[in-house]
Amino acid sequence: MVNKNLKVAVLGAGAMGCLFGGLLAEKGLSVVLIDVWKDHVDEINNKGLKMMGHGGDRTVKIKATTDPKTLQPVDAIIIMCKATALEKALTNSKNIIGDKTMLMSFQNGIGHEEIMQNIAGKDKVLGGSTTQASSIQGPGIIQNHASLPSWIGEYDGGHSQRVKDLAETFTSHGLETIAEEDIKRRKWMKLFALTAIGPLSAIFDLHHTDLYISNKNQKMSRNLGKEIILETREVAKADGVDVSEKDCLEMFNRIVDSRQTNKSSMAFDVLTVSYTHLRAHET
């Protein structure tokens, strides 16, 4: 059932947080963006969020803040901050978590949900995954690189009415979302793709089409990509998710064939001498 009165907070208003929040707000949901980048937040509040690319260039009116303490509890929290900032950001935002608030992370990688469960409680945390792509063009400006689906599901698996209702609500408000029975497997399938793109893209400073199609060393690149995916498969098995070698290689071939021209976030992190997502899982 679609809930037109759903109140949403997006924790982390970078490229993807602004994309998700902007799409939902554009279609009428109550959405607030939370981020520490004051210039970005001020630009959004003063001039609106400028969204370019897929769907056409337009400006969306949406609320943004650097201080979650000023907010009331919401129905759903979409987490899009850097993995390295997750624990601190969510702890600082505990006041917006109500008795029935649902939290979901669309961050890349595995392990975010366990951090969220420790802070908010296991019963409130869903899993999420997305194939959307976006980039920041400047304060208050994003570029939408794709109009592709996202998935949410109970983190331990199975069906639930709350997931079905939330997926329908997001979809009816501009963010195509599918209720997924096995969200953990879905997240691992996304991670297979990321491990084949992110590290090599960062090392060679190439976007993914140049990496696998249009460079003279593409054979070497493809062999490395396949080896990385198959090694990732072994890690997934240790986490209880068994994906066949055939499915892994089919995933890799889809990556090569998709001819995306955006660089990985890891490549941008290396270029700007920022911490990559990997730092969040160091011990």
Regions found by a protein language model. Give the residues of each.
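C-terminal substrate-binding/catalytic lobe of Rossmann-fold NAD(P)-dependent oxidoreductases
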Residues: 221-228, 233-275
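Nucleotide donor/acceptor-binding cores
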Residues: 6-7, 75, 148
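Active-site-proximal catalytic alpha-helix in oxidoreductases
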Residues: 184-211, 220-233, 258-261
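Conserved small/polar residues in nucleotide/adenosyl-binding loops
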Residues: 276-283
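Rossmann-like NAD(P)(H) cofactor-binding subdomain of soluble oxidoreductases
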Residues: 34, 58-141
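NAD(P)+-binding Rossmann beta1-loop-alpha1 motif at the extreme N-terminus of oxidoreductases
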Residues: 2-53
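Helix-loop-beta segment of a Rossmann-like dinucleotide-binding subdomain
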Residues: 97, 141-151, 204-214, 262-271
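Rossmann-fold dinucleotide-binding core
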Residues: 106-190, 196
